[in-house]
Amino acid sequence: RVWLKEGIKVTNLHPDDGSAIQASNLFTDLIYYLLTDKRGGIGETLARTDADLDKLIDKDQLSETAKFLRKNKLFCNGAISQPENVRSWLSEKAPVFLCDFILSDGRFSVKPALPVTDGGDINHTGAVTIKQIFTSGNILEDSFKLDYLEAEERNLFKATVRYRVERENQLPGEATVTVRSGEGDGEVPTETFDVTDLCTSRDHAVLIGKYMVTLRKRITHTCTFSTTPYGLDLAPGDYIRVITESSPYSAVRTGTIAADGTITLATSIEDGDYKIIYYATSTDDADAEVVTIDVSNGIAQDWSDSGRGAAIFSLVETLTSENVYRVEQLTLNQENIVEISASEFPCDNGSVSLIAKDIKDRDLFDVF
């Protein structure tokens, strides 16, 4: 090993750097180098000309992300010492810098995994920008699915982050920092994150620990659904609001109605109008029907006159769920239908990211 003060000279994409060709410690500049350089990267394989390369890389987004990295001091210091699959390597390392490596509109880029201000700081006070709202009106029928994380994937933990310590003209050392949520009794397992290959700052390591702990605490599920491409203006990393309605089964809301309208239910039922789904037990017809009944003194009015006879019923209770999600992937299938995959992105009532608020709350974590 040798100690090098600076690395290779690359194009600097931060707006303040004016595309200077010089050493850099920003992950975005490394990405651009690996994707475009024809000797040290895959530029020769990716495209034949520089003009073609520019069409495959979103430099504007890289420039915006560079502001986020520098503002939060998420610096990239390390070496790629062995052959790597560039796309896999970048996807694996992006979370070290609180980012996601994305492919949007056929162009490669990297985007912060958190909402950011125009200046690049983590936005923990302003509402996230909702690009589109999805309801039963634009979600194709029977396509919406929720996938909850396994129980072991939702257990809280304390993060021990290993990072590299550099001293001029000396061999590198190693240090660790542990981050734990201040909530609870502290009796949680430890998960270790080794970022010694790229991280040389304790503050950077602490931010990684806070991010990983908060993700485990806040995110519980992902969703997938299908929609039509018409009017769709989305890309990976965008935020969407999904509003769904459901009528979950409840045993205490299920009962019987006699032919004369007398209601038998596990709990008392107040007078008023109720929407029910029922199966008539007096006929061989197994189809369910939905009707509204007027209940007075525990009797469904006009039930006996309807000729429906005795029935089993369940009160229909419609629950509305409204959540913010972060788009992970969009796929256009052969039927010209767009399939969207997104992960839960918890926000408060003002649409402010709870993950961002947690990370910026100094009193929420114990660091040692």
Task: Label every model-predicted segment.
Residues 1-19:
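Structured beta-strand-rich cores of soluble
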Residues 13-368:
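C-terminal extracytoplasmic interaction modules
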